[in-house]
Amino acid sequence: MLSWNNSWHSSSTENRTMEREIVASYEPKKNNEIRMFESSDEMATDLAEYISQVSEISIKERGYFAIALSGGPLISFMRKLCEAPYNKTLDWSKWYIFWADERAVAKNHVDSYYKSTKEDFLSKVPILNGHVYSINDNVTVEDAATDYEFVIRQLVKIRTVGVSESNDCPKFDLILLSIGSDGHVASLFPNHPALELKDDWVTYITDSPVPPPERITFTLPVINSASNIAVVATGEDKAKAVYFAISDGAEGPDAPSIPARMVQPTDGKLVWFLDKASASFLEAKTKNDGYEHPKY
């Protein structure tokens, strides 16, 4: 694994040299960290340890661990939490599960994030059923968003979910996101009006550019109010989106405004988990001074 923030470390001379070059070109913003992995198994191992540490700290400080998940291949990278030592050592009774976004489909539908999360994660760990806050799939997408925000507001009142010191938004202990090839996070898509919402905690869309069209999603203020945010990216098809989300070279009037770049914690920490393919444009920039910035 390569990892860089204010310091850097690596096991091989070659990796140390490459990492030093990347640090020079991509100095992360304050409280941001980027980790790059050689394999999916290495990423899953590190992600499990990261989540375990955030969980332990949150439970020690607050008595709860409130985590919001998203969809895509993200859940598969949590698989190590279902194995020793984590399945025995984590205080699962203090975990509270939410979704940063969800598709407006039945819970048993193949497109449901709840379904995939239950099959690949929840069914394998002893999290209490009453601590799993899924979306109401028996109402319209608009009502589902309203209901979900109401539920979260009640949990903020009793501090099961924390509250931001900077605003009245919920302060989740961890929001775990993936990134789309277009740079979307949660169900916040490029140039969508939902990106401009300031007061809503949860909103809905009916025009997702990728099916299914109806979804609910956390808004940017809620995402950015989290204590910790982790974004997982894998595959070459994510490389341009990762570049435009992270790179200072992607700034300027001609740079695309992608939602992933708008993920900047107000008072928390952001960690990017990247495989080599998704980080390929970042690496290419360090190896060739004449590298032309990718274009959408």
From Swiss-Prot:
Protein's recorded name: Probable 6-phosphogluconolactonase 1
GO MF entry, a single one: 6-phosphogluconolactonase activity
Enzyme class: hydrolase
GO BP of this protein: carbohydrate metabolic process; pentose-phosphate shunt
Highest taxon of the lineage: Eukaryota
Keywords: Hydrolase
Gene3D superfamilies hit by this protein: 3.40.50.1360
Pathway connected to this protein: Carbohydrate degradation; pentose phosphate pathway; D-ribulose 5-phosphate from D-glucose 6-phosphate (oxidative stage): step 2/3
EC number from the UniProt entry: 3.1.1.31
SUPFAM superfamilies (UniProt xref): NagB/RpiA/CoA transferase-like
NCBIfam families: pgl (TIGR01198)
Known function: Hydrolysis of 6-phosphogluconolactone to 6-phosphogluconate.
Endpoints of the signal sequence: none
PANTHER family: 6-PHOSPHOGLUCONOLACTONASE, 6-PHOSPHOGLUCONOLACTONASE 1-RELATED
Reactions listed under catalytic activity: 6-phospho-D-glucono-1,5-lactone + H2O = 6-phospho-D-gluconate + H(+)
Native source organism of the sequence: Oryza sativa subsp. indica (Rice)
Family that this chain belongs to: Belongs to the glucosamine/galactosamine-6-phosphate isomerase family. 6-phosphogluconolactonase subfamily.
